[in-house]
Amino acid sequence: MNLYEFTFIAQQGLLQQEVEGMAQELGVSLKNIKADIMFQQIKGILEKGSDKFTKRDSEMHAKDIQENLIAYSSFLESFAKILWIELEEDLSNLKEVKLKISKELKDDLKGLGIAQGFIKLPEGGKQIAKNAFIHNAVSALKEDISKHLIKIFQGILQNFGMAEPNQSNKTLEMLLDNIEASGLIKYEYWGLLDFAYPINKMKSGHYCIMCISSTSNIMDEFVRRIKLNENIIRHLSVHVDKFFEGKSHMMNKQVEEQSA
């Protein structure tokens, strides 16, 4: 699970709500990219595993596996977002956050057959950073998910001559890499700000930062598509260890300047 702070500058002619809408659309784009990568990865594995099936057969089975992966992935997204947004830095409100997860994701937990025992503090009262705690919780949940998915996969993989336990486990492990990518966790609009020098003859632009949990291959494709977006004139992707809590440094600085 990689964390990124992705900052983009949108054209000055847009309205604030249009820029914020763009950030949300980019979040949807991350979901779609993940689904596309999953499908292509699954199809490639199936096609290499057997030459007895047509391209249509491979695509049909790949779609079945993809749908199961997306269901679990969507749950992981919701789970991770609650932890990142609601959990205090010192984990002091963990009990309340666990109740929120149980309440909001109750139907998903039941429908996906997931037991609620994956959010645990370190033994012996050891201190742990919030980002490390979330990573451990997501990894534990991912392991629980893999136990359910292997049962689904084995039947499909058997048709492709890939039902050996070790081979099935390796295939599943490869496919599970992308489901940890939670996508857009939160975003922050910084406002219409002046440039130090003109960019494409423009003197100002709308600044927005997105906090993203993703994999490198998903982010590579995301950035490639960003470059095709005519409304975005500049962008910067930075790999970080953790997301900022509350407001970003940029927003706090703006508040200080306005108060001075």
Curated annotation (Swiss-Prot):
Gene name in the database record = rpsF
Query: Signal peptide: which range, if any?
Result: none
Q: Which organism is it from?
A: Wolbachia sp. subsp. Brugia malayi (strain TRS)
* InterPro entries xrefs: Ribosomal_bS6, Ribosomal_bS6_sf, Ribosomal_S6_plastid/chlpt, Transl_elong_EF1B/ribsomal_bS6
Q: Which domain of life is it from?
A: Bacteria
Reported function = Binds together with bS18 to 16S ribosomal RNA.
Q: Where are the transmembrane segments?
A: none
Gene Ontology MF terms: rRNA binding; structural constituent of ribosome
What is one term from the GO cellular component aspect held by the record? ribonucleoprotein complex
Protein's name in the database:
Small ribosomal subunit protein bS6
Q: Which GO terms describe its biological process?
A: translation
The alphabetical list of record keywords is: Ribonucleoprotein, Ribosomal protein, RNA-binding, rRNA-binding
**Which protein family is named in the record?**
Belongs to the bacterial ribosomal protein bS6 family.
**UniProt xrefs under CDD domains:** bS6
